[in-house]
Amino acid sequence: SRRQRQMCIRDSYRRLRNTLRYLLGALSDFDKKEIIDYSDMPEIEKWVLNEVYKLSKKIIEYTQNYQLGDIYREVYDFCNDDLSSFYFDIRKDTLYCSSYDSVERRSCRTVLNILFTCICTWLEPILCFTTEEAWKTQNIDENESVHLKEYYKANDLWDNDTLSKKWEIIRNLRLKVTNKIEEKRREG
């Protein structure tokens, strides 16, 4: 029904907006000096960048074919499944408990900065005002609009099928364990 579609659209928009809000909060005092080289990053950050690499290729193809609905769906799935339900959940302790100059925290924030740029530029043709507001909030000193930015150029070093397969196994195991824990909680 029409009402269900509206609720679905509202919920998906809220998820994307909340992802941007989370990134803005986690990057509030980010300094470019924190950026850490890919080769020094922990494996989970390399996995996220591999996912960014794969998604970036799809987004470019969808853009060339004017498939905005596919862009929205792919970015939504990435934010919901890969980021909110997995990466953000795992890395929240690193963000808030690790020392400010630790490799893990700096790696995480480097990746979050890349994610912010990617998500804003990928969604800017679709969520014009939301991405512009987020962009201006993060880039206070910059006068250029997100609408004048190009997509973030994913590094070919990030392409790693072996890592992708390994983390798919880890994610599936984590999901099974989480489901069992939830089942036991419900049972009391």
What are these regions (language model features)?
Residues 1-9:
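Single conserved hydrophobic/aromatic residue that forms the stacking wall/gate
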Residues 12-24, 43-55, 73-95:
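Core structural elements
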Residues 13, 20, 72, 76, ...:
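Short runs of predominantly hydrophobic/aromatic residues within well-ordered alpha helices
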Residues 63-70:
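Short helix-adjacent coil turns
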Residues 66, 78, 82, 126-129, ...:
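Residue-level signal for short amphipathic helical patches enriched in basic/charged
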